[in-house]
């Protein structure tokens, strides 16, 4: 079996050294070249056709964002951004994802080059996962943008806690791009409340929700503890903790609760935990659960349970998934009412809500 050929792009010699050590400890991976800036990255990407590129953003001569844009235009390649775990780092990361990068790894706080080995396993998993991706080039090849302009918007003056459907969306690797294909396509008058469970660091989720809000007719924000679900509102679960939905006896308002339990959860927030909690607060036939691109099986079993109890479930197809792990598991377990490419999911949600 041929090895996964990786191009490392970083202006720090120490970071290039550490990344090479991390990647080459896996027998399935081969580092074919390194680049010190975006210009070298473009040249080596065109010359060597790597399977995966790891990309720094802040570099001399040509930055990572410019390099990503050029590479995705001329030789579409799975690109993983190595970003800072800061608000500024989050904003540039989301810009990189919009330009075509498939995923990111957030560098730990502190002396970055020394701490990069703390995320070694994440880097290895993501490189191997996106190398097999079929969705990266196909999504990039779609000419139309999911949005055309920013939509200025504030919280509705009169919150409406009654809604026809509850839309649950679970997603991991490749999630920001997939969500940009769905949420901006949903109309502002949608008679539904939306909850998104995205595997993402705590410092990233508020920035991501704000960015998604800029392009959406619906009101998008990071969920706060105790916040109510409302018609026309999209809540993004905070990173680093589990989100559950609860409703007090005799009160017809569903609220968000954050909890460190169950402790055995692998992912924080957990899709399974959030999806299962929805079954305790709302009639199953009012639930539309969507499982998108991601590694592993988080959310797959909850999809089975929602479908068995009368809810409607949609799994993203292999055609567009950056990593066809979570949706594939749901399909194989019988948890998908329907399988769709990501660009058809928003329209289908609108049909189901009607």
Swiss-Prot record:
Q: List the EC numbers from the record.
A: 3.1.1.61, 3.5.1.44
Provenance organism? Carboxydothermus hydrogenoformans (strain ATCC BAA-161 / DSM 6008 / Z-2901)
Briefly state the modifications made to the protein after translation: Phosphorylated by CheA. Phosphorylation of the N-terminal regulatory domain activates the methylesterase activity.
Gene Ontology annotations for the cellular component aspect, listed alphabetically? cytoplasm
Q: Which residue numbers delimit the CheB-type methylesterase domain?
A: 159-354
Could you list this entry's UniProt keywords, alphabetically sorted: Chemotaxis, Cytoplasm, Hydrolase, Phosphoprotein
Q: Which residues carry this modification: 4-aspartylphosphate?
A: 56
Protein name (record): Protein-glutamate methylesterase/protein-glutamine glutaminase 2
* Family that this chain belongs to: Belongs to the CheB family.
InterPro entries xrefs: CheB-like, CheB_C, CheY-like_superfamily, Sig_transdc_resp-reg_Me-estase, Sig_transdc_resp-reg_receiver
Q: Where in the cell is it found?
A: Cytoplasm
Pinpoint the Response regulatory domain residues: 5-122
Gene name in the database record: cheB2
Q: Which reaction is catalysed here?
A: [protein]-L-glutamate 5-O-methyl ester + H2O = L-glutamyl-[protein] + methanol + H(+); L-glutaminyl-[protein] + H2O = L-glutamyl-[protein] + NH4(+)
């Amino acid at each position: 079996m041929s090895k996964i050929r990786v191009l490392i792009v970083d202006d720090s010699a120490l970071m290039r050294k550490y990344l090479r050590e991390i990647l080459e400890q896996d027998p399935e991976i081969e580092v074919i070249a390194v680049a010190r800036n975006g210009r070298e990255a473009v040249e080596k990407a065109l010359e060597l056709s790597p399977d995966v590129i790891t990309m720094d953003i802040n570099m001399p001569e040509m930055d990572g964002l410019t390099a990503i844009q050029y590479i995705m235009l001329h030789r579409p390649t799975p690109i993983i951004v190595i970003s800072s775990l800061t608000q500024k780092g989050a904003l540039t990361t989301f810009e990189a994802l919009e330009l075509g990068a498939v995923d990111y790894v957030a560098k730990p706080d502190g002396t970055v080059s020394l701490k990069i080995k703390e995320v070694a396993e994440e880097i290895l998993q993501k490189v191997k996962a996106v190398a097999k991706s079929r969705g990266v080039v196909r999504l990039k090849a779609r000419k139309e943008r999911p949005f055309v302009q920013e939509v200025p918007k504030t919280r509705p003056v009169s919150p409406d806690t009654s809604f026809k459907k509850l839309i649950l969306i679970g997603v991991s690797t490749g999630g920001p791009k997939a969500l940009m294909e769905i949420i901006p396509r949903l109309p502002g008058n949608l008679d539904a409340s939306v909850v998104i469970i995205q595997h993402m660091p705590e410092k990233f989720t508020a920035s991501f929700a704000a960015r998604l809000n800029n392009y959406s007719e619906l009101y998008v924000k990071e969920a706060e503890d105790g916040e109510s679900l409302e018609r026309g509102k999209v809540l993004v679960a905070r990173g680093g903790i589990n989100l559950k939905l609860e409703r007090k006896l005799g009160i017809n308002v569903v609220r968000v609760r954050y909890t460190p339990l169950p402790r055995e959860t692998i992912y924080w927030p957990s899709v399974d935990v959030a999806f299962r909690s929805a079954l305790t607060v709302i009639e199953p036939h009012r639930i539309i659960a969507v499982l998108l691109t991601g590694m592993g099986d988080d959310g797959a079993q909850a999809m089975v349970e929602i479908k068995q109890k009368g809810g409607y479930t949609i799994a993203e197809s292999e055609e567009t998934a950056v990593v066809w792990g979570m949706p594939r598991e749901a399909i194989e377990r019988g948890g998908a009412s329907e399988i769709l490419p990501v660009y058809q999911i928003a329209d289908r949600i609108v049909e189901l809500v009607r």
